[in-house]
A protein has these predicted regions:
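Ordered, amphipathic secondary-structure segments that act as subunit-interaction surfaces
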Residues: 59-113
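Short amphipathic alpha-helices in soluble, non-transmembrane regions
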Residues: 76-86, 123-132, 187-188
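Ordered, soluble secondary-structure elements with a strong preference for glycine-centered loop motifs
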Residues: 14-18, 72-77, 122, 177, ...
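Core RNA-modification/binding signature centered on pseudouridine synthases
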Residues: 133-219
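Short beta-strand-to-loop capping motifs
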Residues: 6-8, 66-72, 112-118, 173-179
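Short, charge-patterned binding micro-sites
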Residues: 36-66, 99-101
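Extended, well-folded interaction surfaces typified by the phenylalanyl-tRNA synthetase beta subunit core
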Residues: 5-7, 11, 15, 19, ...
Length: 219
């Protein structure tokens, strides 16, 4: 089994998880890289993506696991061939063997850009940091069983808010990503819910890095 580290940026953030899977399957075929298939009545290509992204979220650290029918291709060749077959915004950074077990993924760093047409409100960073220093910030979360209320604070390891321009405030957080997991979009939802006067005109989300249970970069 091999693993690819790839980015998903630009307009590609609007490609759904299922469509991204299909995109990669087609890319392997166009690149002349034959994937193995699962056994059984409905064989499927041996390819999977860890920690599916929400629609509209950018990422610098996505992981794709796959298995080829042959070992005649070098990792560098696989990387080059895939990038030639993929769409703009989906870019493979490296291909390697011997990656960590996905079950050991525990945390991720995310960036949330709050954009204000009329400029970042005065003391916004201080008010938002005060919000996330509380013991309880409960927001609504959509799950398989419907909408539930969830206190997101126990799933936040680090948090900061910093103005990066006159119109943009950057939230940076390290959050749990498995068992339990916190969708970074809930950070923006919390600002809108608890600090409506600081609700931004637009929010951009990005996954920056992923870590194991020891908070070591995961690959």
């Amino acid at each position: 089994m091999l693993r690819a580290l790839f980015q998903k940026t630009g307009n590609a953030v609007y490609i759904s998880h299922l469509d991204l899977m299909r995109l990669f399957q087609r890319a392997f075929k166009r690149a002349g890289l034959p994937l193995t298939h699962t056994q059984g009545f409905n064989p499927r290509p041996s390819v999977s993506i860890a920690l599916p992204l929400s629609l509209g979220v950018e990422s610098q650290c996505e992981l794709l696991d796959f298995e080829l029918e042959t070992d005649t291709f070098s990792n560098e060749d696989i990387c080059t061939r895939l990038n030639q077959a993929l769409v703009e915004g989906v870019h493979v950074l490296s291909v390697y063997a011997g990656g960590g077990k996905i079950k050991n993924l525990a945390y991720l760093d995310c960036a949330v850009l709050l954009e204000y047409d009329a400029g970042v409100p005065q003391n916004a960073a201080e008010q938002i940091e005060a919000l996330f220093s509380r013991e309880d910030v409960t927001v609504e979360k959509k799950g398989k069983k419907g909408v539930v209320e969830q206190n997101i604070i126990p799933m936040i390891r680090k948090f900061s808010a910093t103005p990066v321009s006159g119109n943009v405030l950057k939230l940076e957080a390290r959050v749990c990503c498995q068992n339990p997991s916190l969708n970074p979009m809930l950070l923006g939802a919390a600002v809108n819910q608890y600090l409506p006067d600081l609700a931004p005109d637009f929010i951009r989300y990005s996954r920056v890095e992923i870590y194991d249970t020891n908070e070591t970069i995961f690959r």
